[in-house]
Amino acid sequence: MNEIERRRTFAIISHPDAGKTTLTEKLLLFGGQIQVAGAVKNNKIKKTATSDWMEIEKQRGISVTTSVVEFDYGDYKVNILDTPGHQDFAEDTFRTLTAVDSAIIVVDSAKGVEAQTRKLMTVCRMRKTPVIIFINKMDREGKDPFDLLDELEQELQIKVRPLSWPINQGQRFKGVYNIYEQRLDLFTPDKQKVTEKVEVDIHSDALENHVGDADAEKLRMDLELVDGVYPSFDVTRYGNGEVARVFLGAAWITWGGKGLWACFVKIAPSPHPIQAEERMVRPEEPKFSGFIFKITANIDPNHRSCIAFCKVCSGKFVRNAPYLHVRQNKTLRFSSPTQFMAQKKSTIDEAWPGDIVGLPDNGIFKIGDTLTEGEMIHFRGLPSFSPEMFKYIENADPMKTKQLNKGIEQLMDEGVAQLFVNQFNGRKIIGTVGQLQFEVIQYRLENEYNAQCRWEPVSLYKACWIESDDEAQLEAFKKRKYQFMAKDREGRDVFLADSNYVLQMAQSDFEHIKFHFTSEF
């Protein structure tokens, strides 16, 4: 197995509170990276998840930024990107999906498919990302497994194939039958872990000895139905994102995660070709190429440092080698590239396709930037969507203006939110997906940059990026709508409509102007 074939790079994504970060912790435990998984069950236990490294994440018990964890597991090199589950941070998750080769979607067995899960599955479908679905919390009362599978197919518009099956659920949960490895994983409630792994023929009497007569009979009937209704395991269809593999379990118990983990590493794809604007880039190509999908400021609060996360797409990244920054047409060398365990970094000498490399950033990178050995190529990313909430940001401490401006600039570079400058009054407007992002921005400005800000309401409905082949009409529109015009950070014209009616009237009155609801067109 060569270096490319042994790479596994994936994201763990889900609706809030489905147990995604808990599952990540268990995978780290199985990979030997941590001795005890951070208890994220409730706030009384003062441990925090290893992948939740920001202070605000530790305080609130939620993930607010994608974290990267890399480790060896058997013959494989694994890169996990643990994403924010809260819907306010959907854009960070969308960007993360540009950098992975496959994804685990975590679904709560009681709640089933939720709005956030549907949205994320849409992005996976757009990129044909192979998907494994982990139905979590089978040790609690929830929906019937067959009902959940029907819901997954209908709501996520993807065929499913179960590779494990629960033996009862809720208080009667006894464990799982691993269909993929034809093995029983049994669970004793008072020990909260797998007590026994048994290879057993489900048609033999030995099954009754382990789970009892009633559960043995039900398991046989369920598995017969699974084989009759759902497609057989097909690696090609899974790799094309046409069929999702489904596992059922309970992430906070050591069972389920490990069965999923061993199977997932075996069937997950190695790095795949990536479409650039100019051509298809293949991982086995000899020359290095990669793109920046995330920027994080203050990953170490003791040092005001920025780290750009680079996904290696082809060739081999080598420390201190000269690489072309395509957007700026400059040659750069990196003396201290790093790999990650949440906020803990270690310097590396080389990296291969599928790896995530941390590059020191002093303001030269933007999300979507490409690095190559000289070729002028541009990787396609995901666009920014029109924000759903808008507020003016004002300086609450005039003595800290410099710190505030630097903080806003770095947080916007990270993609925490979007910044617009109103052309009419010059005021800065922050656009976000939800209210929690405003709180995170205010918290981070105060704690990381020693700057104070306050929010003022502004009544806006939608941000529209505008363009037109008719220069005269474009200028006429900008003149008439001057008080609603803004510039984004790239200097592009943005129309800030304050209502759906105003937007529709503008589209009707100016037929030659194109109104875009994403920043890439």
Regions found by a protein language model. Name each.
Residues 1-521:
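Structural and coupling elements of P-loop NTPases
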